[in-house]
């Protein structure tokens, strides 16, 4: 016949503390997010560099204000 229960002399393997479980789950979630973000991208560094450059250009446009000259819109 098969065994339904473990031997009484054997104790259950120690389970990790809740803090350790949370840390492992957080690490796994971060790893999954990184993998999902880079899915389909061959060169991650170039994509990140382009993103930083775009953010810098947007920040520069915000600080410099509207360009001088050009078309003006007036409502009368």
From Swiss-Prot:
Compositionally biased residues, Basic and acidic residues: 18-37
Entry GO MF terms: ATPase binding
Ranges for region Disordered: 1-76
Positions of N-myristoyl glycine lipidation: 2
Subcellular location: Membrane; Smooth endoplasmic reticulum membrane; Golgi apparatus membrane; Cell membrane
The keyword Ribonucleoprotein appears for this protein: no
Residues carrying Phosphoserine: 46
Ranges where the record places region VCP/p97-interacting motif (VIM): 21-33
Mode of membrane association: Lipid-anchor; Peripheral membrane protein
GO CC aspect terms: endoplasmic reticulum membrane; Golgi membrane; lysosomal membrane; membrane; plasma membrane; smooth endoplasmic reticulum membrane
Keywords: Cell membrane, Endoplasmic reticulum, Golgi apparatus, Lipoprotein, Lysosome, Membrane, Myristate, Palmitate, Phosphoprotein
InterPro entries: SVIP (IPR031632), SVIP_metazoa (IPR055366)
Tissue expression summary: Ubiquitous. In the adrenal gland, it is expressed in the cortex at all developmental stages.
Lipidation (S-palmitoyl cysteine): 4, 7
GO biological process terms on file: negative regulation of ERAD pathway; negative regulation of protein-containing complex assembly; negative regulation of retrograde protein transport, ER to cytosol; negative regulation of ubiquitin-dependent protein catabolic process; negative regulation of VCP-NPL4-UFD1 AAA ATPase complex assembly; positive regulation of autophagy
Family in the record: Belongs to the SVIP family.
Function, as annotated: Negative regulator of the ER-associated degradation pathway (ERAD) of misfolded proteins. It competes with AMFR/gp78 for binding VCP/p97, and inhibits AMFR/gp78-VCP/p97 complex formation that is required for degradation of ERAD substrates. Involved in the regulation of adrenal cortisol and dehydroepiandrosterone (DHEA) biosynthesis.
Subunit structure: Interacts with VCP. Forms a complex with VCP/p97 and DERL1.
Protein name: Small VCP/p97-interacting protein
Organism field: Rattus norvegicus
Annotated gene: Svip
């Amino acid at each position: 016949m098969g065994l339904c229960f473990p031997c009484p002399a054997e104790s259950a393997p120690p389970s990790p503390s809740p803090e350790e479980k949370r840390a492992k789950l957080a690490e796994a979630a971060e790893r999954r997010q990184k993998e999902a973000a880079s899915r389909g991208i061959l060169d991650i560094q170039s994509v990140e560099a382009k993103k930083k450059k775009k953010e810098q250009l947007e920040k520069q446009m915000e600080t410099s204000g509207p360009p001088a000259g050009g078309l003006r819109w007036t409502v009368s």
